[in-house]
């Protein structure tokens, strides 16, 4: 039951729930075309679409969360969604071969090359992690975000046993790159001031 005497506990619980909800959706959103193929026309969305497998949807959610300074619940949802999407993309970066459905599909263009597909997925991983990091305003969001990232990885590892070590390595390297870029950006902005 909600206690007016302890709103911090209520905030923490809501933050966790919204992060978890965002992660649950973000972890499987890139494959929405295969899960709802009976609902979505293949002319609109094919597997590994650039629309779902990359930075487009997380970026739109990020802009929406920042533009209107929405409630912390929406911000938490977007953080969870972005982190889980990054995990999904880390596993998608290691297909059995860069041919056919492993390649990114651009609507109205078709399948791209292996190099473009790899670059697009890598850019998506970095963008998703960076956007989540930018949205986190409180230490509790960073702490829960780290937990959500780990939980998303565990769920994906159970579903994709073949490339666990590679995906983990990619996630760690991308995470270090994002933290380094954020610190560099912060230091550069302080020098400019």
Task: Label the predicted regions.
Residues 1-193:
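N-terminal membrane-targeting hydrophobic helices
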């Amino acid at each position: 039951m909600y206690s007016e005497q302890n709103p911090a506990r209520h905030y923490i619980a809501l933050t966790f729930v919204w992060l978890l909800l965002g992660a649950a959706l973000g972890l499987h959103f890139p494959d929405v075309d295969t899960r709802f193929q009976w609902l979505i026309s293949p002319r609109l969305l094919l597997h590994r679409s650039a629309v779902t497998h990359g930075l487009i949807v997380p970026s739109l959610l990020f802009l929406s969360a920042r533009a209107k300074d929405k409630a912390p619940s929406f911000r938490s949802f977007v953080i969870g969604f972005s982190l889980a999407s990054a995990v999904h993309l880390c596993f998608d970066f290691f297909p059995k071969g860069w041919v056919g459905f492993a390649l990114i599909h651009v609507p109205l263009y078709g399948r791209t090359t292996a190099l473009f597909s790899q670059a697009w997925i890598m850019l998506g991983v970095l963008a998703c992690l960076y956007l989540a990091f930018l949205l986190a305003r409180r230490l509790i969001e960073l702490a829960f975000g780290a937990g959500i990232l780990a939980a998303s990885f565990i769920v994906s590892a159970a579903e994709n046993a073949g490339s666990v070590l590679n995906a983990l390595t990619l996630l760690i390297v991308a995470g270090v790159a994002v933290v380094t870029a954020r610190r560099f950006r912060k230091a550069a902005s302080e020098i400019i001031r």
